[in-house]
Amino acid sequence: MERKISRIHLVSEPSITHFLQVSWEKTLESGFVITLTDGHSAWTGTVSESEISQEADDMAMEKGKYVGELRKALLSGAGPADVYTFNFSKESCYFFFEKNLKDVSFRLGSFNLEKVENPAEVIRELICYCLDTIAENQAKNEHLQKENERLLRDWNDVQGRFEKCVSAKEALETDLYKRFILVLNEKKTKIRSLHNKLLNAAQEREKDIKQEGETAICSEMTADRDPVYDESTDEESENQTDLSGLASAAVSKDDSIISSLDVTDIAPSRKRRQRMQRNLGTEPKMAPQENQLQEKENSRPDSSLPETSKKEHISAENMSLETLRNSSPEDLFDEI
């Protein structure tokens, strides 16, 4: 059997504390037993299920809602003082309670009680029940306290493990971050080096292209100049060939003239004089040939020969010719 004891103050005797006990078998809706005492006297009464249904009909309320209001009024420690009020008439043993709603109040329930002949027994049962309830609550409190201590230890253990996990996690994150920074810096260094290599390669390529362009321009300019140089060289070689041929012819003729003027015998003879005269007579015929050779040499381009060689050659020929022209038989004999 379940029971509930609460402390109330009656409207008729507010200075006296009364104790109200409500006990029931299954549910409050199936009926309950109510006991009221002031510590000296005791009153008790039984409320059946039919009476509860009759009260709900009189209140024009559903039974379940009415039982809920009874629970709040009788089992919740009389509720707030300004919501539920209790009153009891010792002469008629009539107990009733009301509910206040702002300025309106209505009677929630009323029961007829009977006075107990041996109130001490009722009071003793109330005291025993209270002590048992206190002991039970104390045991529950101890059990709950132990459970709380165990949970606190478990919580501390879990908190310690959690802190260790957090520390390990932070250390792992720090380590991973450091490794990530190292890898990132290495990648950045490699990227910078590759970028620098690309820039250097591009600069070298530009330099090579510029050098190739300059080389191509120089080669084109050299190719343009080579034909002119080759032509001038060919002309100079032809002039040198012609002049060398003329010079050799002139030298050979001078040698012949000089050899013709050599005298081997010391004593003069008529034959020698005659031969000399014939030679002198034929000498003017050779002069035109020398003049023709000089004209040919002068008509040819002599830009390739040095001026000094030309002058020496011409002076040698003139001297030989003048010597031949000015020489006479008498002079030759005088010299001999």
UniProtKB/Swiss-Prot annotation:
Q: Which GO terms of the cellular component aspect does the record hold?
A: cytosol; DNA ligase IV complex; DNA-dependent protein kinase-DNA ligase 4 complex; nonhomologous end joining complex; nucleoplasm; nucleus; site of double-strand break
* The organism's taxonomic lineage, starting at the top: Eukaryota, Metazoa, Chordata, Craniata, Vertebrata
| Annotated segments matching region Interaction with IFFO1 | 1-213
Impact when changing R161Q: In SSMED; no expression of the protein is observed; complete loss of function in DNA double-strand break repair
What's the protein name? Answer: DNA repair protein XRCC4
Phosphotyrosine modifications at: Y229
Q: Where is the composition biased (Polar residues)?
A: 317-329
Q: What is the effect of changing I266G?
A: Abolished cleavage by caspase and ability to regulate phospholipid scramblase activity
Q: In the UniProt annotation, what is the result of changing R270A?
A: Impaired ability to localize in the nucleus
- Please give the annotated consequence of changing S193D: In XRCC4-Asp mutant; phospho-mimetic mutant; abolished ability to bridge DNA
Cite the record's tissue specificity text.
Widely expressed.
Instruction: State any single GO MF term.
Output: identical protein binding
Entry comment on modification after translation: Phosphorylated by PRKDC at the C-terminus in response to DNA damage; Ser-260 and Ser-320 constitute the main phosphorylation sites. Phosphorylations by PRKDC at the C-terminus of XRCC4 and NHEJ1/XLF are highly redundant and regulate ability of the XRCC4-NHEJ1/XLF subcomplex to bridge DNA. Phosphorylation by PRKDC does not prevent interaction with NHEJ1/XLF but disrupts ability to bridge DNA and promotes detachment from DNA. Phosphorylation at Ser-327 and Ser-328 by PRKDC promotes recognition by the SCF(FBXW7) complex and subsequent ubiquitination via 'Lys-63'-linked ubiquitin. Ubiquitinated at Lys-296 by the SCF(FBXW7) complex via 'Lys-63'-linked ubiquitination, thereby promoting double-strand break repair: the SCF(FBXW7) complex specifically recognizes XRCC4 when phosphorylated at Ser-327 and Ser-328 by PRKDC, and 'Lys-63'-linked ubiquitination facilitates DNA non-homologous end joining (NHEJ) by enhancing association with XRCC5/Ku80 and XRCC6/Ku70. Monoubiquitinated.
Result, substituting F106E: Abolished interaction with NHEJ1/XLF
* Cross-linked residues, Glycyl lysine isopeptide (Lys-Gly) (interchain with G-Cter in ubiquitin): K296
Source organism, top-level taxon: Eukaryota
